[in-house]
Regions:
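Primarily recognizes the serine-hydrolase "nucleophile elbow" in alpha/beta-hydrolase
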Residues: 95-147
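Predominantly soluble domains enriched in secretory-pathway, periplasmic, or organellar proteins
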Residues: 1-2
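Serine-hydrolase catalytic machinery in alpha/beta-hydrolase-like enzymes
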Residues: 5-111
Length: 147
């Protein structure tokens, strides 16, 4: 299993997500965008991405706070997440940046095909915003799945 740290722009911030895939599997696979819980892009989020990826998917674990910003406890996570949760436009921008990065990075490694640009599944912790962020972004029907 390969988990590559990928830096990408998110508004005025630079974020650092993880592109995860089984390098021993050949052929194209569906891509899955994984939005971690409000603790952000932790080792646990990457391990969850590895479990989801298995030998069937390419997974991108998104970074919602920016590279190097990692909450250490519940209170700090709340302080970082609440402004994002209150701003639907920023949420959409965050998800779109992560989605576009996932598609570009996976295509560059020849892991997905062009059809992947028209669909996405976002896996997120059960939050009040996960379902409403994914659907309107790409003007295509898009489903979200909560794990």
């Amino acid at each position: 299993m390969r988990a590559e740290k990928i830096k990408y722009p998110m508004g005025t911030l630079t974020s650092e997500g993880a592109l995860i895939y089984d390098e021993n599997v050949s052929g194209k696979r569906p891509a899955v965008l994984l939005a971690p819980n409000w603790m952000g892009m932790t080792d646990k989020a990457v391990r969850r991405g590895e479990l989801v990826a298995g030998n069937r998917y390419v997974v991108f674990v998104a970074d919602m706070y920016g590279a190097g910003t990692r909450p250490v406890d519940f209170q700090e996570a709340a302080a970082l997440a609440n402004p994002l949760r209150a701003d639907a436009i920023e949420q959409r921008s965050w998800v779109r940046s992560a989605f576009e990065t996932m598609i570009a990075q996976a295509k560059a490694r020849d892991l997905i095909d062009a059809a992947a640009q028209r669909s996405a599944f976002a896996l997120a912790a059960a939050t009040s915003w996960s379902w409403r962020v994914t659907a309107p972004l790409w003007r295509q029907p898009c489903r979200s799945m909560v794990i």
